[in-house]
Amino acid sequence: MEHNGTAALGWAARDTSGHLSPFSFTRRVQQEDDVTIKVLYCGICHTDLHIIKNEWGNAMYPVVPGHEIVGVVTGVGAGVTKFKAGDTVGVGYFVDSCRACDSCGKGYENYCPTMVITSNGTDYGGATTQGGFSDVMVVRQDYVVRVPASLPPDGAAPLLCAGVTVYSPMVEYGLNGPGKHLGVVGLGGLGHLGVKFGKAFGMKVTVISSSPAKRGEALGRLGADAFLSSRDGEGMAAAAATMDGIIDTVSAGHPLVPLLSLLKPKGQMVVVGAPAMPLQLPAYAIIEGGKRVAGNGVGSVAECQAMLDFAGEHGIAADVEVVAMDAVNAALGRLERNDVRYRFVVDVAGTMHAAAAAAASS
């Protein structure tokens, strides 16, 4: 450990082009309650695209993206009791919170108003946070989770964001009961994990998509019980009032009213996708039948650990395409075109340093 911090190598965006290239920087000195982690794999989330292209207007360049991190502990501070060197661990969307607000007190650190996000955030010392497209992380132990040995580390990486984003509201709103009927809207990175968790909970799962071509994927590859095209008026009408709950994972603008019609009275819809345009929600659509609509943003540390433990017990991992670091820009371009089944994961430990050396010599 260097006196002034740990030398780190990452791949960073430097402007709104979003193009990533090698970037050397320094992680903070390991503190008493810190865990130092060698990054093995990091998933690519659509949020990373928003950040590196400054689509949310808050990019702090240069910025290293990545918040779906799986790695191995290489060092711990003197006060660390939860982890030891050699443990396989994960880091998700945030790496710190205030610990003093109402949300933190109730165990919902993910809703802390001053939560420190893993990439493109500002820590409590004023430094910009750099994410998991890097070879090393230094994180407080309370924001690190244990990854079960039964999970493949590459397939586990997207669980740190996409997995907990669907798992958390399913448990929170009782959409995890055997025999209940769950609708999963969208069959992408979030949706395919919603199907997997729903089936593991013993639920009847119907995939709802605007793309009829995804029927085979939903029923064959993922084992959903039924498929419903949102463009099929007759099919939608026949399925009215049949579902106990719906997880809406779609990030493109779409009408909610046809989806709400699928819910039984007192049914629950949870929105986890984030369309850029405001969603339209006429009051009558929820008044009739006493239906409820909620949102969800990732999950707490405890929820993330519970999700990983459940995934480990039931063999749930993301379906991933692993890419080398020198292919990350191409992967980001494909993600922008929705050309992935279902998540990209970067092989950080296996390819980063070779990719940086090749970039330096070119």
From Swiss-Prot:
Cofactor note: Binds 2 Zn(2+) ions per subunit.
Cofactors required: Zn(2+)
Record GO biological process: lignin biosynthetic process
InterPro entries the UniProt entry points to: ADH-like_C (IPR013149), ADH-like_N (IPR013154), ADH_Zn_CS (IPR002328), CAD-like (IPR047109), GroES-like_sf (IPR011032), NAD(P)-bd_dom_sf (IPR036291), PKS_ER (IPR020843)
List of residues binding NADP(+): 47, 165, 186-191, 209-214, 249, 273, 296-298
Domain of life according to the entry: Eukaryota
Positions that bind Zn(2+) 2: C98, C101, C104, C112
EC number(s) given by UniProt: 1.1.1.195
Catalytic EC class: oxidoreductase
Catalytic activity reported: (E)-cinnamyl alcohol + NADP(+) = (E)-cinnamaldehyde + NADPH + H(+); (E)-coniferol + NADP(+) = (E)-coniferaldehyde + NADPH + H(+); (E)-sinapyl alcohol + NADP(+) = (E)-sinapaldehyde + NADPH + H(+); (E)-4-coumaroyl alcohol + NADP(+) = (E)-4-coumaraldehyde + NADPH + H(+)
Pathway recorded for this protein: Aromatic compound metabolism; phenylpropanoid biosynthesis
An annotated Gene Ontology molecular function: zinc ion binding
SMART domains (alphabetical): PKS_ER
Record keywords: Lignin biosynthesis, Metal-binding, NADP, Oxidoreductase, Zinc
Similarity remark: Belongs to the zinc-containing alcohol dehydrogenase family.
Subunit structure: Homodimer.
Protein role: Involved in lignin biosynthesis. Catalyzes the final step specific for the production of lignin monomers. Catalyzes the NADPH-dependent reduction of coniferaldehyde, 5-hydroxyconiferaldehyde, sinapaldehyde, 4-coumaraldehyde and caffeyl aldehyde to their respective alcohols.
Protein name per the record: Probable cinnamyl alcohol dehydrogenase 8D
Organism: Oryza sativa subsp. japonica (Rice)
The organism's taxonomic lineage, starting at the top: Eukaryota, Viridiplantae, Streptophyta, Embryophyta, Tracheophyta
Underlying gene: CAD8D
